[in-house]
């Protein structure tokens, strides 16, 4: 009987390992540029995720969004902050989303493309560098505060992105006075006076799943287990 039990345990363990190995990692196009970051530690964090990725920087990044080049990827991970985007690149970006390519917008990528109105519809929100209009009234530019303690609350415990996540604290850069569309699905919130009400949400654009996660400024966030888990599950879900 003992031999049978040992054999069954070995079989189950072997089957589990084979299943894990056979599950291909999510193939990610990782885009940066327009904002500096601690490359060594950020890339070390990415290596912990169930992904394989190619890294491209601006000004060459938009070329990778063309249909014949983006096809090989499951998800685009934005950690860039360019100011402008050419009309042709806008068309490629939208065409990519209309075909269902997953998109994860991380931290300062929330602050990109001030002059492109469609970007707020894609992301479901925007960090405004300049005064902006809401309900007919002028709003002040958005703000940022480094090294801010944020108490984060899980708004939807059943969503795949927040599965296994409980409320947590994180030291990160806070974004205040931002625009968030009422049509997004809230996942993580905070009541910090220095930050907008949400730090993570999902949106739909075209046929694509879009995730916005405003956390992730530096190693204080990148080493936070809750942040790593949320980012990992966001990429998998967006696929």
Where are these regions (language model features)?
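Sec-dependent signal peptide recognition
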Residues: 2-10
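C-terminal motif of bacterial Sec signal peptides marking the signal peptidase cleavage site
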Residues: 18-19
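Extracellular ligand-binding/catalytic regions of CAZymes and related secreted enzymes
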Residues: 23-26, 194-196, 204-239
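Helical hinge/lid and interdomain linker segments adjacent to catalytic or ligand-binding clefts
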Residues: 27-31, 37-113
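Short, solvent-exposed loop/turn segments at secondary-structure junctions
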Residues: 35-36, 83, 110-111, 192-194, ...
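Short, solvent-exposed loop/turn elements at domain surfaces
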Residues: 36-41, 86-87, 195-198, 220-224
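Catalytic beta-strand/loop cores that center a nucleophilic Ser/Cys/Thr
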Residues: 40, 44, 49, 140-209
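A glycine-rich, often tryptophan-bearing local segment used as a flexible ligand/cofactor-contacting loop or short
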Residues: 83-160
